[in-house]
Amino acid sequence: MAKKTAVELIALQCSECKRRNYTTSKNRKNIQGKLELMKYCSFDRKHTLHKETKIK
């Protein structure tokens, strides 16, 4: 089997409307906790907190 890499693909979910607006990658060796960023939500039309979720 293939070896697991340190880079993982994740989705960023808006904390207000609960939609997954962004996808990005994260290095698990450098960032241990969940990623939280202030990003623009086009559905709410404002900057909101986006939290890391898994891509299904």
Curated annotation (Swiss-Prot):
<dbReference type="InterPro" id="IPR038584">
    <property type="entry name" value="Ribosomal_bL33_sf"/>
</dbReference>
<dbReference type="GO" id="GO:0005840">
    <property type="term" value="C:ribosome"/>
</dbReference>
<dbReference type="GO" id="GO:0003735">
    <property type="term" value="F:structural constituent of ribosome"/>
</dbReference>
<protein>
    <recommendedName>
        <fullName>Large ribosomal subunit protein bL33</fullName>
    </recommendedName>
</protein>
<dbReference type="InterPro" id="IPR011332">
    <property type="entry name" value="Ribosomal_zn-bd"/>
</dbReference>
<comment type="similarity">
    <text>Belongs to the bacterial ribosomal protein bL33 family.</text>
</comment>
<dbReference type="Pfam" id="PF00471">
    <property type="entry name" value="Ribosomal_L33"/>
</dbReference>
<dbReference type="InterPro" id="IPR001705">
    <property type="entry name" value="Ribosomal_bL33"/>
</dbReference>
<dbReference type="GO" id="GO:1990904">
    <property type="term" value="C:ribonucleoprotein complex"/>
</dbReference>
<keyword id="KW-0687">Ribonucleoprotein</keyword>
<dbReference type="GO" id="GO:0006412">
    <property type="term" value="P:translation"/>
</dbReference>
<dbReference type="InterPro" id="IPR018264">
    <property type="entry name" value="Ribosomal_bL33_CS"/>
</dbReference>
<dbReference type="GO" id="GO:0005737">
    <property type="term" value="C:cytoplasm"/>
</dbReference>
<keyword id="KW-0689">Ribosomal protein</keyword>
